[in-house]
Amino acid sequence: MNELDSLVESAQQLFAQAQTPADLENAKAQFLGKSGKVTELMKGMAQLSVEEKKSRGAAINVAKQGIEAALTARRKALADAELQAHLKAEVLDVTLPGRRRGQGGLHPVSLTLERIEGIFGSMGFDVAEGPEIESDWFNFTALNTPEDHPARSMHDTFYVEGGTEQAPNLLRTHTSPMQVRHAVQHVKKYRERLDAGQGMPEIRVIAPGRTYRVDSDATHSPMFHQCEGLWIGENVSFKDLKVVFTDFCKTFFESDDLVLRFRPSFFPFTEPSAEIDIQFQSGPLAGRWLEVAGSGQVHPNVVRNMGLDPEKYIGFAFGMGPDRLTMLRYGVNDLRLFFDGDIRFLSQFR
């Protein structure tokens, strides 16, 4: 083994002994640094002849390449060892139980709304949607509510910016405006047929959604839900209202022995009008009459505001509170519990 082979072997051994990158750099300096052994060998060629320089320089370069290869290999080995140590320090114990992820669910009122839509959908009713910021015309005027009606007072209605003094904007106080909007669009769609005396398909729609009134106690909230229904055609009677709503209540409460009664009442948008009460024959509420909805035959002025002839088209409307239906179905006495955001309470209804 000549001098250069011994030099390469010596470098390999020294590099292998280095335990850290810093140790390796110190070992490198002994061979490849400014005063390293390879550098000294290169300097020693100054006294050689041209031919000797060629052969000696080539041999030194081969040795230098061997040293650099050993240096690169050791650098990689140290980097791999450092990575493995780092990964080992951060290893996860997969046998530990994971953190429990809470499972969400629909709000009980949302469940009620879905149930209402499903029942009326099976009877052929569409579902209407509309803006919660409504115009005075759709909310009151179109529904035959006179200008001096108490409901128009700021004590009962939230008025908002926008609109005009003659037609202010407000947070809708019921979902009836959605019925009018739906009916107006329906009539517009079939206007040519109506003008030709060919008639139109019946208007059969429910309008569920949020409504707002200045009211707050155990059974009332400033924001509450309503679902109103409308059926207009050429031969729709109060009898149809009784059949439809009776079927709905029995299906919703899953009770065939449920009893309904219609009490005479007054609403500006229906004539005649009736409050609807139900009576359970069994359970904790058995024997009590519970008010669940208002209803009546659609007033001729409202039919006229929909763009129809009240002499030819007639129908019924009803309005109920999904919040109250939810209270009755689950036996909850305080409406505010549904909107306090208490997960412990709401999770019972999943």
Curated annotation (Swiss-Prot):
An example Gene Ontology biological process: phenylalanyl-tRNA aminoacylation
Alphabetical UniProt keywords: Aminoacyl-tRNA synthetase, ATP-binding, Cytoplasm, Ligase, Magnesium, Metal-binding, Nucleotide-binding, Protein biosynthesis
Reactions it catalyzes: tRNA(Phe) + L-phenylalanine + ATP = L-phenylalanyl-tRNA(Phe) + AMP + diphosphate + H(+)
Subcellular location: Cytoplasm
Entries under PROSITE patterns matching the protein: AA_TRNA_LIGASE_II (PS50862)
Gene3D superfamilies assigned to the protein according to its UniProt record, in alphabetical order: Bira Bifunctional Protein, Domain 2
SUPFAM superfamilies with a match to the protein in the record: Class II aaRS and biotin synthetases (SSF55681), tRNA-binding arm (SSF46589)
Record carries keyword Transmembrane: no
InterPro entries xrefs: aa-tRNA-synth_II, aa-tRNA-synth_II/BPL/LPL, Phe-tRNA-synth_IIc_asu, Phe-tRNA_ligase_II_N, Phe_tRNA_ligase_alpha1_bac, Phenylalanyl-tRNA_Synthase, tRNA-bd_arm
Family listed: Belongs to the class-II aminoacyl-tRNA synthetase family. Phe-tRNA synthetase alpha subunit type 1 subfamily.
Subunit structure: Tetramer of two alpha and two beta subunits.
Protein name: Phenylalanine--tRNA ligase alpha subunit
Recorded name of the encoding gene: pheS
